[in-house]
């Protein structure tokens, strides 16, 4: 509970960058990217916080303060001030001009002062305004502002992870930090330091110790005058770091007397410029904000909207009546008002019809059967296809009109109704449209119902059009239709549920009228999106990729998920014990290098061990929180500095293997099938590769003995074997095709070992004289260069001097000159078009390809080189899967496709089919694409995945 006593005259001072950074990182795992590929996370988060403040407080006086950039007076005293901070992310740099324009459109003043930070400007403004009788609210999450809190000066702190603000006055600051006065925050920071600003503080003194010292001595000055009262190591730390403590206090002190001219009129908010706001929010695609501020166009409505239940049997003449009654519309009338940009079901004309009787079902089937295409969706009790029960079906054949078939709780009656729709759903002459159709196909499959005909999945269509963005229906409806869909939680009456959502299994408790609208809207909106995407696919020359590769793959993936794979859980349990013993051995080996117990799983303790006690490097890098970096990338670079690092890396690898796979896989076994059923994701990886989840089988390590052992647990069914078919060096073969390099084409055409042949050319020796080490280096170069590897990167990977790595790369390009030309052309094409594409027309967009930031641009250039290769490989294996599936159906094989992992397909094959099926798979995969070099597939057979691979 707040104990503040604010005055009626409030002034709000906002620390812009503190809020901008917070907003940007809040969306880091799921950034907001608009249709132009612009990351709007920082802008959207900042404006939402500003909006909430204005709605809650309606401030008359408000100012937003920016850091000016460049060095300040603190840098003149301490060069290392904020030196550890990473460069401002490119997306934040790009966001600042937009944010400033939006602030101006809100009628709010912007302040910044050369040589001073926003803290100092706000500190000075706060003290002056306090003296003039105002209540000052400093809006920032940063703790250093606590030192400014005083009578009528408050910290107005945005809550993390939820809406609202916490107002901190004197008593709240004292209670939060254990201080007698907010001003002591300066002394607290002086002792404990502040990693975010690289303020060193007193080494070895953390927040707890610093708080106790301030509690005991009152201030740093008093502490330094009474060091004789300290004892032991603490005394040594304080005495030896006296000057650093004083320096840290100086750096932590926010100035309150900088020379800034200020009048209250300058921070008085002016009227908003709604024209500018509309322009900016439209450009940024902030539809929620457009809706919130009612910034839509003024139009004349010719008639009121109808959102009542219509008749199933309405014809164009609107003459028929039925058991399902149609409510009449109001008389048309002219009204002029502002239409919010984001429409909803409440202000959009629609006709959503409930189907309950047998006659209605027959009539609906007749209507759907008379069309060449329809959209459908299932409403179910679970997102798990093995658990889901269908509670309803929705259909649409034209925009703004849809039908909902409500299914009873009775399982037998539900199955009877579904069987009536089966011929329609399985009809190959009728095109089916849906959103995430793999799910609907799987659920209907549980009832013995297939889905036939050409398919159009709006989720996959949007993925091809804009692979980097989100593909859920809610998002797409907002972007392409300016429409806000009904959210599941809104189907329930209580406010708490509306905000937090309800488990999907509670769908049977939803009032039927609401469920009808919700389900019909899904089918209706999906159909409207289909009409938009179909044209866009054509305009982008993506129709063939969509209809010939992506859509035929959908039912195949559904079938693979249903097939699942057997797991030997006893073997995994035994292997878990083996790994635990190995981990204990590594722990003993690590402890042999240290004289004190250590938690090997603690990055903090590992950092202190490596960089403070063992001092393996002079200037170790740190994270934003001031902790030593001990991530895998950092430790890999240091692995030869001390034997303990290799042990730490090995310990981490085994522990991850144990927790992520060995112990986790048995928990994912479906009790109904005794198999694991991974989910294959078609719209996640922008290059077109499939990913898998629950479990993720793409990341099972295969290069080391420990990781390979996990594959042993994937076993064949009784009377069967596992068959693994793996493309050999497919990405290099694609590089040879795309680049047309004669030397590379020749090596593949003659069937040479490509890595040995590469080594012979790089090192300018006969093929017979290539050593194993030379081949290893050439292999690393082969695969590294198609990912745009640098000399530094190659030297790190091969653990060789950079000069030698550079010589290898130079030798590579000298040997394969067309490869270098291809790489340059790919980058140039990306710069010119903003995208690159695969052999089959898949587009991969690169918004950062012309970035002014060299590292950001370099990353985009590497993607420009590799994405067409990786994407083409993804397209090829998808075509192969379609061809193999056709062979299985054509020959009535009992063999089942179970897994797809990168360039490998895994099948469960009855022993009686092995020889014939092996040839069918090999032929289908090797003829999936026609390249200038042959595609080669290695096929293996075994009782488990490891044996087969």
Task: State what each model feature region is.
Residues 581, 585-588, 592-646, 814-862, ...:
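C-terminal polymerase-core module
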Residues 80-94, 150-179, 235-237, 403-420, ...:
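Short alpha-helix plus adjacent loop in nuclease-associated cores
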Residues 241-408, 435, 468, 476, ...:
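Conserved "right-hand" nucleotidyltransferase catalytic core of DNA-directed polymerases
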Residues 502-508, 562, 670-673, 677-678, ...:
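Conserved catalytic core of nucleic-acid polymerases
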Residues 13-14, 138-140, 374-376, 455-456, ...:
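Short hydrophobic beta-strand that contains or immediately precedes a catalytic carboxylate
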Residues 182-249, 290, 574-601, 810-813, ...:
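Accessory alpha-helical DNA-binding modules that contact the DNA backbone or grooves
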Residues 2-139, 143-171, 244-247, 253-261, ...:
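Noncatalytic, basic helical substrate-engagement surface that gates or grips nucleic-acid strands
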Residues 3-5, 11-12, 22-61, 79-80, ...:
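Conserved RNase H-like, two-metal-ion catalytic cores of nucleic-acid enzymes
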């Amino acid at each position: 509970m707040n104990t503040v006593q604010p005055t009626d005259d409030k002034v709000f001072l906002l620390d812009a960058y503190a809020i901008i950074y917070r907003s940007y990182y809040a969306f880091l795992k799921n950034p907001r990217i608009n249709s132009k590929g612009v990351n709007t996370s920082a802008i959207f988060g900042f404006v939402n916080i500003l909006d909430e403040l204005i709605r809650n407080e309606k401030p008359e006086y408000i100012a937003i303060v920016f850091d000016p950039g460049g060095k300040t007076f603190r840098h003149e005293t301490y060069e290392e001030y904020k030196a550890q901070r990473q460069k401002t992310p490119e997306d934040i740099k790009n966001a600042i001009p937009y944010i400033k324009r939006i602030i101006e459109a809100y009628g709010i003043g912007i302040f910044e002062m050369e040589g001073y930070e926003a803290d100092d400007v706000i500190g000075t403004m706060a003290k002056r305004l306090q003296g003039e009788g105002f209540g000052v609210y400093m809006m920032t999450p940063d703790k250093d502002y606590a030192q400014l809190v005083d009578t009528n000066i408050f910290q107005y702190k945005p809550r993390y992870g939820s809406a609202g603000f916490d107002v901190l006055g004197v008593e709240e600051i004292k209670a939060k930090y254990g201080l007698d006065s907010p001003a002591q925050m300066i002394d607290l920071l002086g002792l404990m330091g502040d990693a975010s600003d690289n303020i060193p503080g007193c080494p070895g003194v953390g927040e707890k110790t610093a708080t106790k010292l301030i509690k005991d001595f009152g201030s740093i000055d008093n502490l330094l005058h009474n060091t004789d009262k300290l004892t032991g190591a603490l005394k040594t730390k304080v005495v030896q770091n006296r000057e650093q403590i004083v320096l840290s206090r100086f750096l932590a002190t926010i100035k309150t007397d900088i020379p800034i001219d200020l009048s209250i009129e300058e921070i008085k908010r002016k009227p908003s410029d709604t024209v500018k706001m509309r322009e900016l929010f439209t450009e940024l695609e902030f539809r929620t904000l457009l809706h919130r501020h009612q910034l839509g166009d003024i139009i004349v409505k010719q008639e009121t909207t109808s959102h009542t239940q219509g008749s199933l049997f309405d014809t164009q003449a609107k003459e028929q009546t039925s058991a399902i009654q149609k409510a009449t519309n109001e008389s048309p009338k002219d009204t002029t008002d502002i239409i919010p940009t984001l429409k909803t079901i409440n202000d959009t004309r629609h006709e959503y019809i409930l189907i309950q009787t047998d006659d209605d079902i027959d009539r609906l089937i007749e209507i759907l059967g008379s069309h060449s295409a329809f959209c459908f969706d299932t409403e179910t009790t679970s997102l798990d296809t093995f658990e889901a029960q269908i509670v309803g079906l929705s259909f649409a054949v034209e925009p703004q009109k849809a039908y909902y078939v409500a299914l009873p709780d009775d399982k037998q009656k539900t199955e009877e109704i579904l069987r009536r729709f089966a011929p329609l759903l399985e009809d190959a002459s009728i095109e089916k449209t849906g959103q995430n159709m793999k799910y609907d196909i799987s659920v209907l499959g549980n009832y013995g119902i297939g889905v036939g005909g050409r398919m159009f999945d709006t989720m996959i269509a949007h993925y091809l059009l804009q692979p980097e963005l989100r593909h859920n229906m809610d998002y797409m409806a907002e972007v392409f239709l300016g429409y806000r869909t009904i959210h599941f939680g809104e189907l329930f009456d209580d406010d708490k549920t509306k905000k937090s959502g309800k488990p999907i299994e509670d769908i049977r408790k939803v009032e039927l009228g609401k469920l009808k609208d919700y389900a019909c809207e899904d089918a209706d909106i999906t159909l409207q999106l289909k009409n938009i995407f179909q044209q866009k696919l054509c305009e982008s020359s993506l129709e063939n990729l969509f209809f010939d590769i992506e859509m035929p793959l959908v039912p195949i993936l559904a079938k693979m998920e249903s097939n699942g794979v057997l797991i030997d859980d006893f073997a995994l349990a035994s292997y878990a014990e083996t790994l635990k013993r190995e981990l204990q051995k590594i722990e003993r080996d690590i402890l042999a290098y240290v004289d004190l117990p250590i938690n090997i799983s603690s990055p903090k303790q590992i950092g202190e061990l490596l960089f403070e006690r063992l001092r393996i490097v002079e200037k170790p890098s740190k994270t934003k929180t001031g902790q030593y970096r001990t991530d895998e990338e950092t430790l890999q670079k240091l692995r030869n500095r001390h034997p303990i690092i290799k042990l730490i890396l090995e310990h981490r690898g085994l522990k991850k293997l144990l927790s992520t796979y060995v112990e986790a896989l048995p928990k994912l076994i479906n009790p109904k099938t005794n198999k694991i059923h991974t989910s294959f994701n078609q719209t996640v990886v922008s290059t077109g590769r499939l990913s898998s989840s629950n479990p993720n089988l793409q990341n099972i390590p295969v290069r080391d003995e420990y990781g390979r052992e996990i594959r042993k647990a994937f076993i064949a069914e009784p009377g069967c074997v596992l068959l693994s078919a793996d493309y050999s060096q497919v990405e290099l073969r694609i590089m040879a095709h795309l680049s047309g390099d004669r030397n590379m084409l020749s090596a593949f055409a003659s069937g040479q070992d490509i890595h040995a042949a590469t080594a012979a050319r790089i090192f300018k020796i006969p093929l017979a004289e290539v050593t194993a080490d030379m081949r290893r280096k050439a292999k690393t170069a082969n695969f590294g260069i198609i990912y745009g590897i640098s000399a530094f990167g190659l030297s790190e990977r091969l653990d060789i001097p950079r000069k030698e790595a550079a010589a290898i790369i130079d030798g590579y390009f000298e040997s394969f000159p067309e490869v270098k030309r291809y790489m340059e052309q790919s980058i140039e094409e990306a710069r010119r078009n903003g995208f690159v594409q695969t052999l089959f027309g898949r587009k991969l967009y690169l918004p950062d390809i012309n970035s002014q930031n060299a590292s950001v641009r370099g990353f985009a250039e590497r993607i420009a080189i590799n994405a067409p290769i990786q994407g083409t490989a993804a397209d090829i294996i998808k075509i192969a899967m379609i061809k193999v599936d056709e062979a299985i159906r054509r020959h009535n094989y009992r063999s089942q496709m179970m897994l797809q992992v990168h360039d490998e397909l895994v099948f469960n094959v009855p022993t009686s089919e092995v020889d014939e099926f092996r040839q069918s798979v090999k032929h289908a995969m090797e003829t999936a694409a026609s390249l200038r070099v042959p595609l080669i597939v290695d096929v293996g057979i075994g009782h488990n995945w490891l044996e087969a691979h």
